[in-house]
């Protein structure tokens, strides 16, 4: 136990020494006064998928998270509020609720007469239900639903690539004429609501069930916006009325022939999203430095998604953090983001080195970076379908030092814990596995036996092992094997001592076997 504690302590002390040596102004034991270092961007300006999934709209106090996705039909970018996660849909996802109307429509222009049922509406009723006609406030046949489906047919609202990121959602609604419920499966859909207190102060989006129509993800009255918009819910008392949102008041009813806004929801697939930034997608018109919350170019909690890139571009940060080597990224943009804002730099060759001092995060000379520490750095490009793909920069680990392994001693327990203080390695006290004859061994070491120590290491996020990474084990050159999750470092120790023969003139067969490891 004491030995293990000493190993951990030495590894921690060595790590601290290495970290402190990277700080400007630390020279020996005498610090010098320097300008304050920049810090990493706050989550309001840069977040991963888990951060996106943490937003909700069910409380007045909730901070609104927004995603820029698609257009509003007139060529302007459309913003969507993050309502939460749809537990009825597999995989990483969030429900998006339009932050402003996509258009307007009547719920149903033909409001006076019932409609004969048509299977082409693709409404699914409970088994055995016979439906011959429906009321004018039936969502499945409504002009409202037809208009929302129209938005998915051309590219005025969503590009073909954007449409592939949108999940279908199965939603239930009530059929008042037939005293039952039915479901439809669409991408864009109207929210559900109830005008009976206290349920009239929220609406719901996402997957629901036939026995809990208002059981989706809640959106509080304070998050509805300023427009009267249609819900998919029919009125309980009038077949020619359906429910709407009356901003700041409640859910209420309106005649189906009236024109109201369309504020739909949909489910966004996050499976290939890498991260999101408040920085807009870089372009010739969006480059250079952009400060947080300035000229609406970096708005807190309003994100542009960055999808995972499958390209061979790479940005490698030097171990001291002062430069980046960029390869295979001609015509892409290098993005550097910290707590001040973001800097977008166009790459104009396939092999380019960028110094930290080339990036100025503000108007003053002192805003030039000394290093890329505490920055989010990535390469990105945006295609004609408005899909931005990105690849995070990494710091390459070129050499590994593993220490504090005690060589095997015959008759004694193997040392199973090493120390590693190399920057970027995920653990400072890796486990040692001992190999003999191609098999792992435990317990005590044998006599006159050669053992190989094997240590598997993984890199921290933002680091990767170089293809030709070198390693030493207690100062001696070791072999390195790269694997899917990291590297395995191996070193073969000398044979353990032979077992002494107790009688110099007489030895049993067992004595000889122990002595020579037969």
Predicted region positions:
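N-terminal secretory signal peptides that target proteins for export/translocation
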Residues: 1-5
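Surface-exposed interfaces of beta-sheet-rich extracellular modules
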Residues: 449-476
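Serine/threonine-rich, repeat-prone extracellular segments and beta-strand-based repeat modules
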Residues: 431-454
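Sec-dependent N-terminal signal peptides of Gram-positive bacterial secreted proteins and lipoproteins
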Residues: 7-27
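Sec-dependent signal peptide cleavage junction
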Residues: 20-40
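Conserved "repeat-terminator" motif of extracellular CCP/Sushi domains
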Residues: 482-500
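Collagenous Gly-X-Y triple-helix signature in extracellular proteins
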Residues: 37-332, 336-395
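Solvent-exposed, low-complexity, repeat-rich "mucin-like" stalks and linkers
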Residues: 397-424, 498-518
